[in-house]
Swiss-Prot record:
Organism of origin: Desulfitobacterium hafniense (strain DSM 10664 / DCB-2)
An annotated Gene Ontology molecular function: tRNA binding
Name the record gives this protein: Large ribosomal subunit protein uL5
Lineage of producing organism: Bacteria, Bacillati, Bacillota, Clostridia, Eubacteriales
InterPro entries: Ribosomal_uL5 (IPR002132), Ribosomal_uL5_bac-type (IPR020930), Ribosomal_uL5_C (IPR031309), Ribosomal_uL5_CS (IPR020929), Ribosomal_uL5_dom_sf (IPR022803), Ribosomal_uL5_N (IPR031310)
GO annotation (BP), single: translation
């Protein structure tokens, strides 16, 4: 079982129940899923770029990503409906907790000039979005083997009803918010 999952059930859930005075244990907010998305804009000209992004994302998450395709044609971008334009992975369960653990304890401290993540990126419904500028912060990615530095969006979907609950949950899980 994932280390962070144990910590959640033994320490974090009781602390959240105490703080927000939940009557029922099912009201306690928890991490539902983590979605990692990599937009590959250059895939319009270079179809090999998608393969590199898929490879990087599968190394980082340990799960095969799904290729996202364009929903509409946009002539200005030379984009047609159905063209591959990115990749994404949805993590749940133990894999999700292991990824979050690695992200917070290994990857984020490797970011240059890191002073914590913004606490303003909540969407009003208890979900948090984190943007990462380069995939090199993950130890699974070797510097010599990448073709291009790519960023990614990481979305933490929680069962929290408010941003305050979600902020408290992620803070207790170890998210390094700016002071």
């Amino acid at each position: 079982m994932a280390r962070l999952k144990d910590k959640f059930s033994s320490e974090i859930a009781p602390a959240l129940q105490q703080k927000f005075n939940y009557k029922n244990v099912m009201q306690i907010p928890k991490l539902e899923k983590v979605v990692i998305n990599v937009g590959v804009g250059e895939a319009i000209q270079n179809s090999k770029a998608i393969d590199a992004a898929v490879g990087d994302l599968s190394k980082i998450t340990g799960q095969k990503p799904v290729v996202t395709r364009a929903k509409k044609s946009i002539a200005a971008f030379k984009l047609r409906t159905g063209m591959p334009i990115g990749t994404k992975v949805t993590l749940r369960g133990d894999r999700m907790y292991e990824f979050v653990d690695r992200l917070m304890n290994v990857a984020l401290p490797r970011v240059r000039d890191f002073h914590g993540v913004s606490d303003k990126a909540f969407d009003g419904r208890g979900n948090y979005t984190l943007g990462i500028k380069e995939q090199l912060i993950f130890p699974e990615i070797e510097y010599d083997k990448i073709d291009k530095v790519r960023g990614m969006d990481i979305i933490f979907v929680t069962t929290a009803k408010t941003d305050e609950e979600a902020r408290e949950l992620l803070g207790m899980l170890g998210m390094p918010f700016r002071k």
